[in-house]
Every structure is written in structure tokens, then in C-alpha cells.
């Protein structure tokens, strides 16, 4: 039985990966009058007078909505919201297991931006935060931006920002090991979708020396007439030397590569053309842009992938549980760039200096100290930037 067959069998046994459990014991008539009618009327009236009391009198303060339209589920494409439910349930289970954050899956049967935004906005008062998941680009950018204007709780598209945060953490530590300064390096991102653009923005915020983005048409350069709005925005702040050409052209002399694209796009010759001690994060799943052994044989100094069977797994699970735990703890109204940067630095800091090496640049996914450290850093950054409400 392979892993796919075993997973299907487990899902049949589980009949869902999450369930609702009562925090209120209802064992007798008195319990019933307190948890439900008539006693429940009093907290309702208190919330009516002061909506912020919803954080104290309900579970809202620890509840995240995990929402998809099913348009970009894993590598499966647009399979629809319902078919994406197993992924959303899995995400909710990870929130609970790693950060004790309650999460609820919501799969929306629509690909219309305004319909999705309005649906989420209308139910947002039930939650303390919104995690958007597996929504295709470029629609995901518009949905997130419009939602941020409509609701006063954090909205976080994990495929963008969770990935970017972990890549940022990995790059910080990789540069330490390779004795490179982030402000001096040239980094190439292959794949200018949701994750690629978010990674680029965070690395620019981090102070990267030169960032070059590549999509299926080649190197993105300001003035290219085929660029969509998101790409045009990135073109203004990347590719300092106005390079044109292919991925191979972009990688010549580059210090680092981040792949969020397709399998086997990077060759040994491309790696050999890079600067000394090249850093490669080949994150296409399940087959990376270049396999680690091939990259190492070609001279790669540090290699990371999205897979757990190779060193340096770049996995969002070390980011999103702690990020939301920290944001919820201070009732943040947003998860801003400073909070994302704080999360990345906290993750990087979870690898002890004396253990940091080319095959250990990120903490283990099961290191339970990571979400705690991330939550503390995120909450602190929220207070410092004025988005914390307690």
C-alpha cells in the first residue's frame, strides 16, 4: 500500500479529521439553563451593547476560519471547494495540534471575487482571524486586498505569506552558513504566482540586494507588455540591471534560487553558472526544480525543498500556527509586514547557532517550541506597530 492508498484508507476510518467538542458540561437542568436558555440571553445582551465582548464571552478569540474556493488545491488545480475539504480539515487539525488554535473549514462554491469576499465578510464576526487557502492567482491577491478593507480581523493567505515567511527564515540562516550578506546577494525567484510574488515582497522588506523574478515568459522586466497587475508591481522594484532572457540567463552569477514553479527546470549547468556557495530552495512538489543530489553534485552549497524526505524542508507548518496564535493573543486587526518579518526571524532563531549547518537551516516541523516563539514575536510586533487591541 503506497502513501496515497494509505491516506485514503485513514480518511475512511477518520470520517473527518476534526470535530466540535463542548467546553461547557451539560449534565443536569442547571447546566442547561446556564449554557443555553434562559441564561444564555445575558451574554447575548452584553455583546449587543459591546461587540468586543464577543472575544470574552464566546470562542471567537481563538477561532480561525480556513477558507478556500478550491481553485488551486495542492498540485491538483481547480477541483472545487468541496473536493478541497480534506485539505482544509487537515489545516484545521494542524492549527489545533501545533498551536491549540481552533479552526473551522469553509469551502465556498464560487470563483467570483466579489461573491467570495462578500460571503466571507458577512460571516467574519464569528471568527478572530481568516486563513485563505488554495485560491488561484491572480484572484487571490484581489480577494485578500478587498477582504482587508472590509473586515477588522487578520486576513492571511497562507500560500503567499506562510511560504514567504519560511523562505525568509531559511534564507537568513543559509546566508549565515554561507557567510553571505542578504543585502549583497542576487536571488532569482522562478514562479511569479501567489507564493513567488509574496516571497519577493518579503525578501525586499528584508533588504535583499538584487531580486530577479522569472515566469514562463522569462525574466520579468519593467515595461514588458504582457505583465498582469501583480507582475507589473513587482517589476518596478526588482531586476535592478533590467536583464532580459531565460531562467538560465537569470541564474548566471546569482547567489541564490527560490523555485515555486515546476519540476526539473533547473539543470546542473545552471547551478554551475551561479556564484560561489550557491543556495537553492527548489520547492516544486512532489518533484523539485532540481533534485538535491544533482544540485549538490553541480556545486550547490545549501539545498532546501518542500519535501520531508530531504534536509531543509521548507514547510508552512512552522509558520502559520504560531502566526495566528500571536495575532489572536493580542486581538490584532491585521497581520502586517512587520509581524511577518518578526515571524521569519523567530523561526530562524529557533535553530541554535552551534547546530546551524548546510543541512540544518530550519527547525524541525515537530519542534513545539517554534509556534511559541513565533507567537511571542508576532504579538510583540503587533503591539509595536499599533494593530494590537489588547
Region roles according to the model:
Residues 124, 182, 250-251, 271-274:
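A short, aliphatic-rich alpha-helical micro-motif
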